């Protein structure tokens, strides 16, 4: 059962005697991976055609009074991502449960950088993700409504859950998928904040370039390995993030600045009118 949390990309394609994590022949050098909860869910996720471009919403909550560490690096990265993709940005107290529930219904890409937790037992009220005003647990997720195409959860253990016979991994992925979320980027363990921020920024860049979700994540991880020191090349730092669900590309929409077009078109139209009038005269 524990193998369900093992990313296939960390397996080796051949025997190796090296102890240097950077030089090991991981499968990620040859293949990209995405995961499915079940064949029926996969079929459901692929039935409805979605728009290629989608607006993004980014969440970065603060945690006053919740006995949690503030994720300062995540906040900086979240703001940079929001600026890059002209996304709606909810930070600190604005990144609350109500705002998240509303965003789920607006057919957007959602990036959430927060604290998450899970336990390998059946206490679903202890599995979930933190917002500025509280904790959204697994049972509560089943009661939400969603039109979300892609949910990026940059938080610990969001892909981890208890095992039930005949049901598999009872995780946030299962809950969000059941309410209509088409695909997710989730964490299989307690992830490192710095490496997660590097990976998600790079992942979104490749997603914008047109790669599928698993291809974009593969490229982000390979870039990370190329620039890592021997310690950070350990799979703990890069293999925890994985794609679950629909693997098709979806580009975060970058809003055009239409003001520049207006400033260009009006003088041009005026010049054309003046030129035609001059010719008539």
What are these regions (language model features)?
Residues 4-6, 24, 28-30, 35-37, ...:
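Caspase-like cysteine protease fold
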Residues 1-107:
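Catalytic-core domains of enzymes
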Residues 88-92, 185-186, 213-217:
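Acidic/polar loop patches that form or flank catalytic/metal-binding clefts of enzymes
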Residues 35-42, 46, 108-198:
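Catalytic cores of nucleophile-dependent amide-cleaving enzymes
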Residues 2-5, 65-67, 97-99, 117-120, ...:
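Flexible loop/turn segments at secondary-structure boundaries
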Residues 74-77, 81, 96, 100, ...:
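Stable alpha-helical elements in mature extracytoplasmic
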Residues 3, 59, 81, 110, ...:
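Residue-level detector of buried hydrophobic side-chain packing
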Residues 68-76, 94, 163-167, 194-198, ...:
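Soluble non-cytosolic domains of exported or imported proteins
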């Amino acid at each position: 059962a524990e193998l369900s949390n093992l990313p296939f990309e960390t397996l080796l394609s051949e025997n190796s005697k090296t102890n240097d994590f950077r030089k090991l022949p991981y499968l990620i050098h040859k293949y990209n991976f995405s995961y499915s909860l079940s064949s029926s869910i996969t079929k459901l996720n692929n039935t409805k055609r979605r728009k290629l471009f989608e607006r993004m919403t980014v969440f970065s909550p603060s945690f006053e009074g919740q006995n949690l560490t503030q994720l300062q690096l995540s906040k900086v990265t979240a703001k940079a991502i929001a600026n890059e993709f002209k996304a709606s940005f909810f930070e600190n107290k604005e990144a609350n449960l109500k705002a998240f529930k509303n965003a789920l219904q607006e057919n957007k890409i959602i990036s959430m950088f927060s604290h998450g937790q899970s336990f390998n037992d059946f206490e679903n009220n202890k599995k979930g993700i933190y917002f500025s005003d509280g904790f959204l647990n697994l049972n509560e997720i089943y009661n939400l409504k969603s039109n979300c195409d892609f949910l990026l959860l940059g938080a610990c253990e969001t892909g981890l859950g208890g095992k039930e016979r005949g049901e598999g991994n009872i995780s946030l992925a299962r809950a969000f998928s059941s309410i209509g979320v088409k695909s997710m980027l989730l964490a299989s363990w307690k992830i490192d904040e710095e490496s997660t921020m590097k990976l998600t920024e790079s992942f979104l860049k490749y997603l914008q370039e047109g790669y599928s979700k698993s291809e974009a994540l593969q490229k982000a991880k390979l870039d990370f390995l190329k620039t890592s020191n021997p310690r950070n090349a350990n799979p703990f730092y890069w293999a925890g993030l994985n794609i679950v669900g629909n693997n098709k590309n979806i580009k975060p929409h970058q809003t055009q600045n239409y003001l520049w077009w207006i400033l260009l078109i009006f003088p041009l139209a005026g010049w054309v009118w003046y030129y035609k009038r001059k010719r008539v005269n």
